[in-house]
Each structure stands twice: as C-alpha cells, then as structure tokens.
Amino acid sequence: MNFPVLKGAGYVLVHTPDMIMHNGTTQTTEKIVNPESEYLKKLPEHLRSFEDVVAYAPNQTYIGSMTPEALGEIAMPWWTEDKKVAGADRYGKLGEIMPQDEFLALMSASDVFDLVLFEKEFIEGAKAKLAAHPVVGNLAESVNAGVELAEIEKQLSEFHAEGLYNNGKLVGCVKRAHDVDVNLNSHTMLENLAVKASGVLALANLIAKNNVNPAEVDYIIECSEEACGDMNQRGGGNFAKALAEMTGCVNATGSDMRGFCAGPTHALIAAAALVKSGVYKNVIIAAGGATAKLGMNGKDHVKKEMPILEDCLGGFAVLVSENDGVNPILRTDLVGRHTVATGSAPQAVIGSLVLSPLKAGGLKITDVDKYSVEMQNPDITKPAGAGDVPEANYKMIAALAVMGKEIERADIAAFVEKHGMVGWAPTQGHIPSGVPYIGFAISDLTEGSVNRTMIVGKGSLFLGRMTNLFDGVSIVAERNTGKVESGSSVSTEEIRKMIAESMKDFAAHLLAE
C-alpha cells in the first residue's frame, strides 16, 4: 500500500508581552471583575525580556534547536536563571522566535482591509526590522503607512478600536470592521489578525526550511481554535486561503478544520487521506496562536514569584505529500478515534486512541517507540496545579500495557522514560496537541533509531456548550521502507473497458450457441 509521507514541518513562537495584559482573557476578565487587584499591579514585574524567552530551554526545543531528550536531561524548573541556554539563537532548525515589534508589523502586512493603524515612528522602525527578516521580509512591502498618535487615540475613545501596545506604550490599534456586527468588532479582528499573522509565519518557515515550492502546494487545512466570519455566518472561514495568499501558494485552495485541541490531529488525518486517495499531491496543515490564552495561568505564576511563562503565541505547519520512499509514512490504516459510544472514562479514551488502532494492525503498545500526546510544558502547568500533562498521559498508556500483560506494573516508570518525552510546547490549546513532535519525528524516523511513532490529539468539546462529549483521534507514523508503488495499477476506466469487452465476448458466445 502506498502511504503518504510527512515531508516537512515548521514551528514558530511570537513573544507578545504586551498582549498578555491587554488580550489574554485571564487578565481582561480580571480588569472587569477586580480592576484594582494585586495581580494586575504585580504582573508587569513578572514579564520576561525577549532575550530570556529565546534562552528558555523549552522554547529552544520548540523551534528545533534542542531535542526533547536534551531538554529532559535538564532538571526542572527550567525558568530559573541558571537554566538559560547559553548562546541561544532566535532562529532554529525547525523555526523561529519572533519579537513583538516585528510581529506587529507582520499583523499590519496581514491586514487587507485597512483595519490596523500604527503610529508613524513606531511602524517605520518595525517595518525596517521586518524587511530584514530572512523568511518573511518580502511582506514588509504590505505594511500600512503610519498615522499620528492622536488618530489612534481617537479610534480608541470614539470608535471602539482595540489598542496595540509595545513596551507598555500605545503604538497602534485594530479598528472594528463593522459598526454593529460583534463578529467583526475590533476585539475579534485583533484575535483573527494575530492568528493569521502567526499562521503565515509558521507556513513561511515550513516553506523556507524544507525547500518547498509554494506553487506546488494543492491544499491547506487551517486548524487553529479561532473562527472568522460575520453576523450571518460567524465561523464561515477561511483562514487557510488567507495563509495561502500571503505565502505564495498561488495554486492552493483550502478550508478550516476545528476540533478544539484535537483539531491538528484531525487535520493531519484529513491531509493524509486527501493525499492517499490521490485527490491532492501536497497538503499542508497549519495554525497560528491564540491571544486569549496568553497568561492563562498567570495568577499562579505570579503567586509563586515566577515569570509569566505563557508570553508567546505558538504556530506550526506540516507538509503531507505523496510517498517519496524516504520520509516517514502516515499509516492511514492505523487511525484511532474517540467515538460517541466511547465514553469519557480515561481508560476508555486512551483505549480508543491507542489500543484499538494498534490491535487492528496486529501491534502491541510497546511496538510504538515514541508517543506524542498533549505535550504541554510542565514548567507552566505544574505550578498551576495541573500537574505534568504528558507524563500523566504516558502513565495511562503504560497502565493499558500492564492490563494487556505487555509490561509489569513495576515497569511503568521505565515505559514512560522509553516511550514518552518531557513536554515543551506552550499551553496554546491546539499547539501542544500531538503535533510538536512531528518535526523531530521526521528526523528520528529517517536518521535516528525510531521506527514507529503515534501522534495523539485530544479535545474538550464541552467548552463549546454543544455537547458534553470528549474527543480525540490518533495516527501512526513509521519509518519508510523505501518501496514505492510504481503507479502501474489498473485504473477504473481500464476496468470498465475490460468488463465491457468480457460482456461483449460473452454475448457473442451466447449468440453463437
């Protein structure tokens, strides 16, 4: 069977410290219910510099400059001064970390309806920095001209615009796109322009770092957790086409796929199916980050005298292509899914996502070398009381292996060590869900000693208040054997002709009798 392959991946982080206070929902909610809170007063003292963000080991892992194994060798917590990565660079093997001023310029470049305004002096400097960028420098030409600060202040005070800040100062705004449509108000437009711009950055990095010809991309599936539309269709879309337009994918179309945190794995399976079926040759899944989740666990971090670690937007892009005999294959016949009948018990959930597809392929849990689950950074989640999320997932998988008599109970810790990884991804919902390992998996399954991995995505659908059901899907990726079908199989049209000729011969035979 000719399976599709994982051809390349790109990962980006965008340091947005000012958006924590002004756009993260933990902070914006606090401003409403308790505007004089000690938390809001102390928060600015707990913001990290761009240099500290770049030198943070989990961030270096996210962009491919450090392996998960190397990160796991560093004792936690990772945020302390003595754990900074010496000589850390903003550019990595798999992507990059972008500073806030460059990103604000990229947001302006992503604006095609003249909704983003910036103060003249600020945007001139930010535009110059963006123009020097090795991957998206060409987009600086699309940055809007600056205006006087008074015009921005007027938009905020009279027309309900949303402010954009840098180093604590007002430098711009996002205007509303409609006078009364809440789906096009300034708050929504800011969120959507941020997810678009960070998605563009991720897609551009995928293209640049994997020598992808954007003109050969057929289809893009955008799988973030935002929605764009208007009052008549608030989730109508389409981020995917918007990303394609900005990254030179002139022959691509696309659509948006949603599933909360499980969205990226749903998109990965859909991309694999589209390529496997022959509908498209090259399909990209991509997503930008969520401003709402910035500083989500900030109260706990400040309470424990930590820096605010949720200070970056995340983004990623993955290319799925036809079998090239080299890159890892996606086993479209080994797909796990949490069905309506599965239920929400942890054992049932993990069983449906891990055990069921492996059994279908005659495999054991221990036959998978590495599992990529919810790869949240425990530096963020443990102080907030959420524990080590990846480790908890691995222990549940190990427990299933114990129940299946594949390992002994005493071997659970060893299983977690061998088949698991420490978490390194930001808590941006869809961003840490399964996909952060794909960039490493491509290397591990081609140049390394890994032969089989499983990408697992899980989602909490109850957040949308439409169902109490849980969700999740998974897919196995394997080392490529190098065998590629020649494509000499008989086509449907040829089969029809053969049947017609056989029927004709049969009819002639009957007439002869």
Swiss-Prot record:
Q: Name one GO molecular function term.
A: glycine reductase activity
Q: What is its EC number?
A: 1.21.4.2, 1.21.4.3, 1.21.4.4
**One family name in Pfam for this protein:** ACP_syn_III
The UniProt catalytic activity note for this protein reads: acetyl phosphate + [thioredoxin]-disulfide + NH4(+) + H2O = [thioredoxin]-dithiol + glycine + phosphate + H(+); acetyl phosphate + methylamine + [thioredoxin]-disulfide + H2O = sarcosine + [thioredoxin]-dithiol + phosphate + H(+); acetyl phosphate + trimethylamine + [thioredoxin]-disulfide + H2O = glycine betaine + [thioredoxin]-dithiol + phosphate + H(+)
Q: What are the UniProt keywords, alphabetically?
A: Oxidoreductase
The UniProt entry, under CDD domains, shows:
init_cond_enzymes
Write out the GO biological process terms.
fatty acid biosynthetic process
Asked whether the UniProt record includes RNA-binding among its keywords, one would answer no
What is the documented function of this protein?
In the first step of glycine, betaine and sarcosine reductases, the substrate is bound to component PB via a Schiff base intermediate. Then the PB-activated substrate is nucleophilically attacked by the selenol anion of component PA to transform it to a carboxymethylated selenoether and the respective amine. By action of component PC, acetyl phosphate is formed, leaving component PA in its oxidized state. Finally component PA becomes reduced by the thioredoxin system to start a new catalytic cycle of reductive deamination.
The record describes its quaternary structure and partners as: Heterooctamer of four alpha and four beta subunits. Component of the glycine, sarcosine and betaine reductase complexes, together with proteins A and B.
Protein name (Swiss-Prot/TrEMBL): Glycine/sarcosine/betaine reductase complex component C subunit beta
> Which organism encodes this protein?
Peptoclostridium acidaminophilum (Eubacterium acidaminophilum)
Encoding gene per record: grdC
